[in-house]
């Protein structure tokens, strides 16, 4: 367990904004957690759990508390039968490493297990996946999530929680709502995957990719490679550009609202989803810069920090985008990344 003081949040998050955290503790083993929480309790300081920092925005006032940076690692097979396999990954592993591991396993008939291949190249850690119920290209983690192991800081003990206890929804779980916020440190995640390949029709852009190439076999590796190529063509490389990935949530409409939207020429996808990127782009904002934040010219739902020096700059840019979409379409966009610290 490593401990540091006065660490800029900007160094811990991919948007590269935010003041200093009073303490940062790196959690390298499960047994570190009791000591780390005891330290915070003795200091009477709040805690915050951070993985790769790709879905968190640091605020200018910093965090007068203790940030736990997740450094737990390890991926392994728990059990399997002829049709499926259960994989466990420690929460500090990259989600993409788990996906890569799953598509390279021999399943008895061919290479790879299916269930999370469309989540390829999503930035962030395994532990963050159930918090936000991450999803992309037609898959969500809740579709394959079996269970999680957590440290409950309220009860000061480790617990095993099944997926159906987590209230998983669109970017929603018990971990980011109500009393569950900050209560649990996820130490590992178990997914249950199957050997049967995905079948068309796929998510719109993924199906178009396969149609253009005449793809007929949809092995987990083929789907992973396709998603990786699509994401690379649309999304900024987090190693090169400061961003937090998808910045705005999609809009979800009921049946009546969906019909009204379609009558106005607004695309509505399965489940009543209106893509926020389409709204932003068609409001004329793609590639535009506000207060040092640029709307990506590849995918309009992404904000890139070109020269912003403060959370205040980001907040003004965010509001400019929200106002423009609201004025043109009447929908109010919501931010997807969480925020850390005081304004």
Language model regions located:
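Anion-binding (especially nucleotide phosphate/pyrophosphate-binding) glycine-rich loop
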Residues: 1-155, 165
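Phosphate/pyrophosphate- and phosphate-bearing ligand-binding catalytic cores of soluble enzymes
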Residues: 4-5, 11-17, 56, 158-313, ...
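Phosphate/pyrophosphate-binding loops and the adjoining catalytic core of nucleotide-dependent enzymes
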Residues: 321
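Conserved ATP-binding N-box helix of the HATPase_c
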Residues: 325
């Amino acid at each position: 367990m490593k401990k540091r003081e006065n660490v800029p949040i900007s160094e811990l998050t991919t948007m590269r904004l935010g003041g200093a955290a009073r303490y940062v503790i790196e959690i390298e083993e499960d047994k570190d957690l009791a000591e780390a929480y005891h330290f915070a309790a003795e200091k009477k300081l709040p805690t915050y759990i951070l993985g790769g920092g790709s879905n968190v925005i640091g605020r200018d006032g910093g965090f007068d508390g203790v940030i736990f940076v997740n450094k737990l690692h390890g991926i392994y097979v728990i059990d399997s039968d002829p049709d499926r396999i259960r994989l466990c990954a420690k929460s500090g592993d990259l989600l993409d490493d788990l996906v890569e591991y799953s598509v390279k396993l021999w399943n008895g008939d061919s290479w790879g297990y299916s269930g999370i291949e469309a989540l390829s190249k999503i930035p962030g850690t395994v532990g963050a996946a159930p918090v936000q119920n991450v999803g992309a290209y037609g898959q969500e983690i809740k579709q394959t999530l079996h269970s999680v192991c957590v440290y409950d800081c309220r009860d000061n003990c480790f617990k095993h929680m099944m997926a159906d206890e987590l209230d998983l929804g669109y970017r929603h779980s018990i971990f980011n709502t109500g009393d569950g916020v900050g209560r649990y440190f996820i130490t590992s995640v178990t997914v249950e995957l199957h050997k049967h390949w995905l079948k068309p029709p796929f998510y719109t852009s993924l199906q178009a990719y396969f149609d253009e190439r005449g793809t007929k076999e949809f092995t987990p590796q083929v789907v992973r490679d396709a998603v990786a190529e699509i994401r690379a063509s649309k999304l900024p490389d987090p190693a090169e550009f400061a961003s937090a990935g998808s910045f705005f949530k999609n809009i979800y409409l009921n049946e009546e609202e969906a019909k009204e939207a379609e009558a106005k020429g607004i695309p509505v996808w399965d489940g009543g989803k209106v893509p926020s990127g389409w709204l932003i782009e068609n409001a004329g904002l793609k590639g535009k810069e506000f207060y040092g934040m640029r709307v990506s010219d590849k995918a309009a739902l992404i904000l890139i920090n070109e020269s912003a020096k403060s959370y205040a700059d980001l907040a003004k840019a965010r509001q400019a985008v929200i106002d423009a979409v609201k004025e043109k379409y009447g929908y109010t966009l919501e931010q997807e990344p969480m925020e850390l610290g005081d304004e």
